[in-house]
């Protein structure tokens, strides 16, 4: 695998906003975008809404290059004052117009009739929607004569390129992760070892206790970490096992913290591995190899590189150290997940860094999170977030790697 750098390009680097426009120009359908969801569950809706948060489903769409939305009286004033949309339309008025456009109805017009009425008024023949668009609404809009195209890939592919402001928001998410790790380290330092047990404040230390402490600390700093992984021993060998029950001394504990910043909606995503007690040589070698693989992966990241090449560097590092991946009817051991994924308004978004070819773009933000998992020995994963640059990766996360706590 080549590790040589691409030759320097003499042209002036484009700002992130310009790169976003170039990516957007390659959207799979020329039709304007349409969304009907809320900003709490939809990263696309939050992106399109330029950060203003509305927690009930609402109509948002493009018309003549403008971002438009329909809001009830409850939200109209707040959304209007935010200036996040180019045009804010009152829902009540458009319900009345839909009544007239579809006379004889026994029930008030729903989203489909309102959207169809809007489309006629705005002289729009149809819309482009995401694969997550409500199926019933999709069918109804087509029945009403609108062309509805499902986007091939992301609805807003330009989301992949992060501006400096977005990168700072993701860095804040990772700062919250670091807050959580500091809490974990403090608890593990204060915990006492009694045989194989870990005792904290006169109680057995459990995964749930760690998870609760992490959530509380992050909430106090302005974030939410609803799902936290704090899994020890063989539980940690299932990468998405959250962890439950007592944690044991001298066993590896994977802590994966992916908080959302409540103010902005952007996510962080970091993982560290810990052990309270004394590690065996096999455990130390496992952790050292994962750390080496992560360094190799990060060193390979730069604009224009195939993400599969980053993944291969991780695989090569593990193979050179003698760690095998095996699959069976009972599950897998070794390294059996991707090296990374995009992070932004969703904790998992484009691009994916795995065996599939994909050219990394300047400004993309990805995780690099290799791991090794062997029941009986334990699991280790180390994860950081980087922004893809023309000459390499820029870390957007920071926390020490001190993992063995006596």
Predicted regions span which residues?
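Active-site neighborhoods and metal-handling regions in enzymes and metal-associated proteins
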Residues: 2-406
């Amino acid at each position: 695998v080549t590790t040589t750098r691409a030759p320097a390009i003499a042209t002036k680097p484009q700002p992130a906003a310009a790169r976003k426009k170039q990516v957007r120009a390659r959207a799979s359908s020329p039709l304007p975008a349409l969304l009907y969801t809320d900003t709490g569950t939809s990263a696309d809706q939050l992106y399109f809404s330029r950060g203003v948060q509305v927690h009930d489903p609402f109509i948002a769409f493009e018309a003549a290059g403008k971002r438009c939305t329909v809001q009830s009286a409850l939200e109209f004033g707040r959304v209007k004052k935010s200036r996040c949309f180019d045009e804010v339309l009152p829902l009540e008025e458009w319900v009345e117009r839909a009544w007239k456009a579809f006379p004889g109805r026994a029930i008030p017009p729903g989203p489909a009739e309102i959207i169809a009425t809007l489309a006629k008024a705005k002289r729009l023949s149809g819309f482009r929607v995401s694969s997550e668009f409500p199926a019933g609404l999709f069918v109804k809009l087509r029945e009403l004569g609108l062309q509805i195209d499902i986007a091939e890939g992301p609805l807003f592919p330009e989301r992949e390129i992060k501006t400096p402001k977005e990168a700072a928001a993701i860095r804040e998410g990772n700062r919250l992760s670091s807050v959580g790790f500091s809490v974990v380290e403090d608890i593990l330092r204060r915990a006492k070892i009694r045989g194989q047990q870990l005792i904290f404040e006169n109680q057995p230390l459990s995964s749930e206790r760690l998870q609760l402490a992490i959530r509380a600390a992050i909430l106090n700093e302005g974030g939410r970490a609803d799902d936290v992984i704090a899994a020890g021993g063989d539980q940690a060998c299932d990468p998405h096992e959250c962890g439950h029950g007592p944690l044991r001394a001298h066993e590896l504990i994977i802590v994966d913290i992916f908080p959302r910043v409540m103010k902005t909606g952007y996510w962080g995503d970091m993982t560290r591995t810990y052990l309270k007690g004394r590690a065996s040589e096999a455990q130390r070698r496992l952790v050292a190899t994962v750390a080496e693989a992560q360094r190799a992966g990060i060193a390979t990241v730069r604009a224009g590189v195939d993400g599969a090449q980053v993944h291969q560097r991780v695989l090569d590092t593990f193979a050179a150290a003698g760690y095998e991946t095996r699959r069976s009817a009972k599950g897998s051991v070794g390294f059996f997940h991707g090296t990374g994924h995009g992070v932004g308004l969703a904790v998992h978004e484009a691009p994916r860094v795995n065996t599939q070819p994909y050219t990394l773009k300047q400004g993309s933000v990805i995780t690099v999170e290799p791991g090794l998992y062997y029941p009986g020995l334990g699991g280790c994963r180390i994860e950081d977030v980087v922004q893809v640059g023309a000459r390499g990766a820029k870390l957007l996360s920071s926390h020490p790697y001190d993992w063995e706590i006596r």
